[in-house]
Amino acid sequence: MKAYNILLFCIMFCLSVSIHAQKQIVFVDEFESDIKVPQYVLTNIRAAVIDGIVNTNRVQVVDALTVAPNSEHSPMENALGYRAGYLLQGKLLNREATDDGFSGRKFHSRENSYKEKFVLRIQLIRTSDGTIICNRNYEETGSSGGKYASQYHALERALVNVPYEMRNFIEQYFRVHGSIVELVSDNGKKAKSVYINLGYDDPIKEGQRFDVMVQTSMAENYMEHKIGEVRIKEIVGPKYSLCKVMSKGAEDILKAIELGSKLHIVSSQSRLFDE
């Protein structure tokens, strides 16, 4: 009996490992700079990029600065060493930090005004064959004014949009697919709620939106087109989530379900979450 329990534990552990392995692993290399900048600038930019990626819950991030990879190996070798499917590299191409403050006439006062502008190149490489999946530049700007303004605060303002950019980045290259498996409720004309076959085991979050796609055929060619959207209301199990059907397209979704059509869902790029 004891041996049976041990065997059962091992099986469940292996299943757990395989489940969590569904998330793609992204190895984030140390960022470089083509120009001389204070270290805090590169550190904060990189941290904002990583935070934005991690908060999507879409991929597993391995931070090169945290795991201390082998310095004798190339970034690609280190990424493969951590079984990462992708290598992400960043390079600061340009930075403009300006102090536009001016002195006032009264009491020799000074109005502080700082501006920050930088261009960062993000490169995503597939480790299996070295293919560059993405090579894109991001330009961000920010400013800080007033008595307590500083260049650091201007940089913080410039980083505000980075999480949103990274969310779109991850959504573009790591989309999630699933299906509607059951109609939960309707009002006779429109679908109100459904179950989808994605849950705790998948890289999803409550509030996340999905496009609902139905397959059609034309001249013996099959294609999919969007008929509506659903939003995750509650993740209820390893492979199930309760979703609210958004009003636009809810009638078409109900008709498709009643006809027995298979409805494919794919994470939406237009609006990922309700916030």
Q: Where are each of the predicted segments found?
A:
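Glycine- and charge-enriched low-complexity intrinsically disordered segments
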Residues: 237-275
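Positively charged n-region of N-terminal signal peptides that target proteins for export
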Residues: 1-6
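Anionic-ligand-binding alpha/beta catalytic cores of soluble enzymes and soluble regulatory domains
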Residues: 145-185
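N-terminal segment of the mature soluble domain
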Residues: 23-91, 131-135, 204-208, 213-220, ...
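A structural "domain/chain start" motif
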Residues: 20-60, 139, 144, 173-193, ...
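Bacterial N-terminal signal peptides
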Residues: 7-16
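Short secondary-structure boundary motifs at beta->alpha junctions and helix caps
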Residues: 110-119, 126-161, 220-241, 246-252
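Surface-exposed short loop/turn segments
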Residues: 75-125, 235, 271
